[in-house]
Amino acid sequence: MPPVVGKKAKKGILERLNAGEIVIGDGGFVFALEKRGYVKAGPWTPEAAVEHPEAVRQLHREFLRAGSNVMQTFTFYASEDKLENRGNYVLEKISGQKVNEAACDIARQVADEGDALVAGGVSQTPSYLSCKSETEVKKVFLQQLEVFMKKNVDFLIAEYFEHVEEAVWAVETLIASGKPVAATMCIGPEGDLHGVPPGECAVRLVKAGASIIGVNCHFDPTISLKTVKLMKEGLEAARLKAHLMSQPLAYHTPDCNKQGFIDLPEFPFGLEPRVATRWDIQKYAREAYNMGIRYIGGCCGFEPYHIRAIAEELAPERGFLPPASEKHGSWGSALDMHTKPWVRARARKEYWENLRIASGRPYNPSMSKPDGWGVTKGTAELMQQKEATTEQQLKELFEKQKFKLQ
């Protein structure tokens, strides 16, 4: 598509990264919109792009104002098999095409309000978990890709994959578009759910055609950066090159196992005590930058103020602050205007950097014991279905959970 007359053409994602620029991603949509009443926890599907476009648009705008350079289409779990999984009505009543098209239109509208790019995103599928063939799974990705091509997104992201095999299938499908492809996996230092180490995952993704690789979701910034470091080492050992990307959770997960925060008993409705502070995220941004990561964003739990923290921490390198910083004093400096003297005394970096945050929950533990069911692709409980989950199926799961808790 030719550039609009009178409008300066935006630099592409690889042009920016190849020049050493910092690209700031956006934050988490499904969790943020679930809290606001627009997404249903459980299926986590993005029909809000059609049903409540104003809510999706506003969240995009807040991330843009906070400093995001990329507007990811709100197409997480927007594959047709997911939109009809376990009794979901979206495919039948709305259609996958309408959801994906609406998400693209909203992202483009907001991206063009600033210097942001639009990334069309696909994620893991019920088809893969149910042991469908490579051809069948790739067909699911292709349905979304056709919409992304029609809407002329700037680049593509294959994100949130627990198995590198499926992530590779996604990259191989997306790369046929001729557009740059990024690929992120929701894995920790132990690797994917089939035991493939992070370094090998990175090598496979790059060989499949990804220009940008890394992690997203499931783990906190500290664990995620350890995983990206292993990916980087894997690429170096294989003499392969790719740009690095990190979009972790905004929840602290030191007690997670291989499955990440989904295994925590608090998932998804009791995670608030684990939320990272803006100062935690500034530390994450600096560590990511020092590691050589240049695409830095967030996933579930990341609100616009977290993205602003990334933009503020890296402002010296980028040369500017985001618009949202107009109402935010650096390291709490605006607290010098507070009426209470002890709060004015907190208007300094040293205070917030060294504060040990209390939870306010005196009888609660600091750590949890993950559920650890150990299920992965091919396990009976992970086989997906079009019909709603039955009472008998739930009863069996409740009994299994009781046994695990004993």
From Swiss-Prot:
Modified residue annotations for N6-succinyllysine: 40, 93, 98, 232, 241, 340, 377
Keyword Metal-binding: yes
Compartment(s) where it occurs, according to its Swiss-Prot or TrEMBL record: Cytoplasm, Cytosol; Nucleus
Functional pathway: Amine and polyamine degradation; betaine degradation; sarcosine from betaine: step 1/2; Amino-acid biosynthesis; L-methionine biosynthesis via de novo pathway; L-methionine from L-homocysteine (BhmT route): step 1/1
GO annotation, biological process: 'de novo' L-methionine biosynthetic process; amino-acid betaine catabolic process; L-methionine salvage; methylation
InterPro entries per the UniProt record, alphabetical: Betaine-hCys_S-MeTrfase_BHMT, BHMT, HCY_dom, HCY_dom_sf
Top-level taxon of the source organism: Eukaryota
Positions bearing Phosphoserine: 330
GO CC terms in record: cytosol; extracellular exosome; nucleus
Pfam families on file: S-methyl_trans (PF02574)
A GO MF label: betaine-homocysteine S-methyltransferase activity
Entry keyword Ribosomal protein: no
Record domain Hcy-binding: where: 11-314
Residues that hold Zn(2+) according to the record: 217, 299-300
Catalytic reaction annotation: L-homocysteine + glycine betaine = N,N-dimethylglycine + L-methionine
CC cofactor: Zn(2+)
UniProt keyword annotations, A-Z: Cytoplasm, Metal-binding, Methyltransferase, Nucleus, Phosphoprotein, Transferase, Zinc
Annotated cofactor note: Binds 1 zinc ion per subunit.
Chief location category: cytoplasm
Documented EC number(s): 2.1.1.5
Subunit structure: Homotetramer.
PANTHER family noted in UniProt: BETAINE--HOMOCYSTEINE S-METHYLTRANSFERASE 1 (PTHR46120:SF2)
Functional note: Involved in the regulation of homocysteine metabolism. Converts betaine and homocysteine to dimethylglycine and methionine, respectively. This reaction is also required for the irreversible oxidation of choline.
The protein's name: Betaine--homocysteine S-methyltransferase 1
Organism: Pongo abelii
